UniProtKB/Swiss-Prot annotation:
One of its GO terms (cellular component) is other organism cell membrane. Antibacterial peptide with amphipathic alpha-helical structure. Active against E.coli ATCC 25726 (MIC=4-5 uM) and S.aureus ATCC 25923 (MIC=8-10 uM). Has a weak hemolytic activity on human erythrocytes (LC(50)=150-160 uM). Keywords: Amphibian defense peptide, Antibiotic, Antimicrobial, Disulfide bond, Immunity, Innate immunity, Membrane, Secreted, Target cell membrane, Target membrane. The keyword Metal-binding does not apply. It comes from the Eukaryota. The structure is characterized by a full length helix-turn-helix conformation between residues Ile-2-Leu-21, Leu-22-Leu-25 and Lys-26-Thr-30, respectively. It comes from Rana cascadae. This is Ranatuerin-2CSa.
Amino acid sequence: GILSSFKGVAKGVAKDLAGKLLETLKCKITGC
């Protein structure tokens, strides 16, 4: 239903944000 598809979208967005955050952190630590 709508709820499960919303959960899927939220999971995708969270994964995307986490990936960007990790990359930014890596850049700050190791220097891009």
